[in-house]
Structures are given as structure tokens and as C-alpha cells.
From Swiss-Prot:
Monomer. It is found in: Cytoplasm. This is 3-phosphoshikimate 1-carboxyvinyltransferase. InterPro entries: Enolpyruvate_Tfrase_dom, Enolpyruvate_Tfrase_sf, EPSP_synthase, EPSP_synthase_CS, RNA3'P_cycl/enolpyr_Trfase_a/b.
Length: 445
């Protein structure tokens, strides 16, 4: 089990942000079903990317890993052999996308996973696919992995709950490729920027669809042509570096390169929010410049950048006023229940943080070094790392292998910016720390 030992430290310097996971996975998928050979430059190398690659190879796609790009020849015939098993690994995108894709085939397809995906809900997507005529059978409890899917989907209309954007994204993919026409309505849509990213890919590939408010219609049976695409930097990953730069005691700024501010990624809005709250952030070409600075808290709607909940919770501990992070219920169904996970771990550091029905209440408070756990969630692990860098005393974060999911060189990049983080593969513990004052919650909402 990998653990981080982190001493208080500040960052400054210049760094290239790693490629976007969301764009990488969609690029690999669409190249695998496209007609011809596609080139994907700067794809993120991660366990989720590998899970997508292996799943797409079972479609018949030929995927070659070059030094700077992926060369992907799409499957000549969009079929899956009888009794194919797709292992989604720990990737929610592979899990949801291939569940929907399996529904277009007339052969039984089995979807399986790593144990971590067992907690990720799938029922709303399955129910929508059943309305199109797909059937599902389960080895255990209904709506739990592993399960088998038998299509094909038939044309029609369905509705899907919008709590998680991946349900609608998966439906859009299946409706594009299956023999249609199809239409669906998203009920109470959340995480709109992430579904917008899926629609951006449809537009980029020339796949037709029509939109009327939250209802989407597809002609179906549309395979894109091969394409060339360069994956830009990941704003979700950049958020952790930005937080470290804002809280830094260094007199120098940090330059985050490889970030296209015109990218559709939803988490870029976090940078505009922080600037609005008083953070000293400037945008220059494909670089975001972060100056150490103070900023206020506030009432913050998390839906536009739900993946930023853990790191924004950390930042709010250092704000000049209280914060209410709301509209964040979907964060409970990620790799962990992020509302509970970040609350439990930051409370170990002395944070004034409480969960509420749809988010978090946070009062500014000093943080102290502590022993913490990642909950096997990459965003929790990275958020706690940034908190530990700005706490009083050393900290340990256990079970941090999960960081490879989106940011494989996270520690290497931070240490290149002058931090003091050590990786250990054996059990480590902190020496007894100085006693700290008890923290009392002040105020409520």
C-alpha cells in the first residue's frame, strides 16, 4: 500500500498540466468506432485509459501505442463476439459507456469490474435502456455487477435521471450508433458541463442530433470518420496545483501550462470562481498564472464543477469567511462518498467542516498534521495532500495508489515545484504531535 508523508511546504515555478482524462477516454472510444485510422496526441496514460483501450480492442479496434500518440484503427464492423466479457476496471466512464454500447448488439455481453465500481449506481441507465428493449440479467442483486446485456435496442423514446451526467452521455453514444431513431429526456439534469463535453464530441465528429430543452433526438446508425485530436490539459487536475499555488508562502507565482481556456471542460469554471472570490489569477495564452493570495468564502453552487468538491473544501478552510458548498449530492456517488470522506479526513486535521443535506458547511480554521486515508479516491488523496502541505506539522495519507487514475505524476510534479513529499510502500506513522486546541463549530445554515 502506497502512502505519502508530507511536510509543510510551498510551491512556485512552471509546470505542464497532464492531459484530460475525460477527453482521453472519449477520444479512444470514438476512434475505436470510427471508420479509418485516427491519431490521438498526448493521451493520458492511466489505469482508466488502459481499461478503455482493452474494452475497445474487444470491439475489434486496433490500437498502437506510439511514443507521442495513439494510432487507432476503428473496428471494420461494429460487432462484439458472442459471450464477450468487458472488464471496466475502476472506470465509471468505461462502465457506463459499455453498458449502453452492449445494448445495441444482438449477442449477450457481460460487464464486470474491479470491486470499487460496485458502489457506483447504474440503475437509471439500465432502466432507460430497458425502455428501448434491451434486457439485463444479474449474477447477484439487481443493478449490481457483474451483469449481462442483450440487445438490440429498438427505436423509441425514454427518460433518464440526470443525477449523474454519465447516464445521459452513455445513452447519447448508444443512440448515435444503434439503428434508430431515438430520443430521450434528461430529468432534473445535473453536471451539465460534463454532458456538454459529450455533445461537443458529437459536434466535433459530425454526428447529428437535435435538442429541445432537455430532450435529445438521434437519427441513429451514424459512425464517424477517422480524426486527429490533441488532448489538452486537465482542468480537474490543475485545480489541485492551483490550490497549492494560492496557499503558497512563496513570493513567486506558479505557471500552469497546457490549459486551453476555451476548452469545454466544466472544471475550468473553478478558476473564474476563485478569481471572483479575490484570488490573484491571470490567463495568458494557454497558461494560467496563480499568485499566492487571500480569498473569501461564499455560497457556492458545486454543480458546474462537482469533481472539485474535495479541493474546494480544502481551500475554504483557508478562506477569510465561511462557505456553503451546495448542490453537491452527486458527489456522494463517485469513487467514494466525497462529502463524508473529505469531512472525516479534514476533521482529523482540525477543520471546522460539517456535511449537510446537499453539500458542506465550512468555517475557516488552521489545519494540523494528521494521519489520514484516501478512501481509495484519487481526488480525496490529492486534496488531502494539498491540505497537508499547508498544515502545521507532518501528515501521512494512506492508500494513495488511486492517484494514478488521473494524475500519475502528481507527486513528481509537486516535488519539482519545491515541495517535500515522500512516497512509502510500507506502513509509516507520525511521531506524537503537539497537542492542539479543540475546534468548535461556529454558526450554521
Amino acid at each position: 500500500m502506497l502512502a505519502y508523508k508530507i511536510s509543510p511546504s510551498s510551491i512556485s515555478g512552471r509546470v505542464s498540466v497532464p492531459p484530460s482524462k475525460s477527453h482521453t477516454l472519449r477520444a479512444i472510444f470514438w476512434a475505436s468506432v470510427a471508420q479509418g485510422t485516427s491519431i490521438i496526441h498526448h493521451a493520458l496514460a492511466s489505469p482508466d485509459s488502459e481499461a478503455m483501450i482493452q474494452a475497445c480492442k474487444q470491439l475489434g479496434a486496433k490500437i498502437l501505442k506510439k511514443s507521442t500518440h495513439l494510432e487507432i484503427t476503428g473496428t471494420p464492423h461494429l460487432i462484439l463476439p458472442k459471450n464477450t466479457t468487458i472488464n471496466a476496471g475502476s472506470s465509471g466512464i468505461v462502465f457506463r459507456f459499455f453498458t449502453a454500447l452492449a445494448a445495441i448488439f444482438s449477442e449477450k455481453i457481460t460487464i464486470t469490474e474491479s470491486s470499487q465500481l460496485q458502489r457506483r449506481p447504474i440503475a437509471p441507465l439500465i432502466q432507460a435502456l430497458e425502455n428501448f428493449g434491451a434486457t439485463f440479467s444479474y449474477e447477484g442483486e439487481p443493478y449490481s455487477l457483474p451483469f449481462s446485456v442483450l440487445g438490440p435496442m429498438s427505436s423509441g423514446y425514454t427518460e433518464v435521471i440526470g443525477e449523474d451526467s454519465q447516464y445521459a452521455s452513455a445513452l447519447a453514444i448508444a443512440c448515435s450508433l444503434a439503428e434508430g431513431p431515438f430520443s430521450f429526456t434528461i430529468l432534473n439534469p445535473k453536471e451539465r458541463p460534463w454532458f456538454a463535453l459529450t455533445l461537443w464530441w458529437l459536434d466535433f465528429l459530425g454526428i447529428p442530433y437535435a435538442q429541445s430543452e432537455d430532450t435529445y433526438s438521434f437519427e441513429g446508425k451514424t459512425r464517424p470518420q477517422a480524426f486527429s485530436y490533441t488532448v489538452g490539459g486537465d482542468f480537474s487536475s490543475a485545480a489541485f496545483l492551483a490550490a497549492a499555488a494560492l496557499l503558497s508562502q512563496s513570493p513567486h507565482p506558479t505557471y500552469l501550462e497546457n490549459l486551453n481556456i476555451d476548452d469545454i471542460q466544466g472544471d475550468k469554471e473553478l478558476f473564474f470562481l476563485l478569481k471572483k472570490l479575490g484570488a490573484n489569477i491571470t490567463f495568458e495564452n494557454n497558461t494560467i498564472i496563480i499568485f499566492p493570495s487571500t480569498f473569501s468564502g461564499g455560497n457556492i453552487d458545486m454543480d458546474p464543477f462537482i469533481d472539485a468538491l474535495p479541493i474546494l473544501a480544502v481551500l475554504c478552510c483557508f478562506a477569510t469567511s465561511s462557505s456553503y458548498l451546495y448542490n453537491a449530492r452527486s458527489a456522494k456517488n463517485k469513487e467514494s462518498d466525497r462529502i463524508i470522506a473529505i469531512t472525516q479526513e479534514l476533521q482529523k486535521m482540525g477543520a471546522c467542516i460539517q456535511p449537510c443535506h446537499d453539500g458542506l458547511l465550512i468555517n475557516p480554521s488552521p489545519l494540523y498534521g494528521a494521519s489520514m486515508h484516501s478512501h481509495k479516491d484519487h481526488r480525496i488523496a490529492m486534496a488531502l495532500s494539498i491540505a497537508a502541505m499547508h498544515a502545521s506539522g507532518d501528515s501521512i495519507i494512506y492508500d494513495t495508489d488511486c492517484v494514478k487514475k488521473t494524475f500519475p505524476n502528481f507527486i513528481q510534479i509537486l516535488n519539482s515545484l519545491h515541495t517535500n513529499i515522500q512516497e512509502h510502500y510500507e506502513h509509516i506513522s507520525l511521531r506524537p504531535a503537539d497537542s492542539r486546541q479543540d475546534v468548535v463549530w461556529q454558526g450554521s445554515r
